[in-house]
Amino acid sequence: MKIYTKYGDEGFTRLYGGKRVSKTHVRVKAYGKMDEVCSLLGVIVAEIRENDKLNRVLGEICKECENIQQQLFDCGSDLATPDRLREYKQKIDDVRWLEQRMDEYIPLLPKLEYFIIPG
């Protein structure tokens, strides 16, 4: 598999199926952001896995993070596929699984009274 194509050298890229779009297209921006989140999850998982004590306590969360990473890759792939040129990988059960995880973890957080500023 080639990791570069040279199609993006002029500010354009190709979606699945060959459709050419600007690198500023909303689809491209969206799967770029998904890649960023996926990378951050990867760093978190790697840090936890390197620490035996943390890994024993948070190993199950690592598995969930890895599942979310796969879902992000699938969703990014779907975003790069215009007009359902193939069946989408992301399924409603994936969304339900993520919602269930959120419902499970949200009560463990302090009450949210305002938006959280990242950093």
State where each predicted segment sits.
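Phosphate/pyrophosphate-binding loop motifs in nucleotide- or prenyl diphosphate-using proteins
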Residues: 1-119
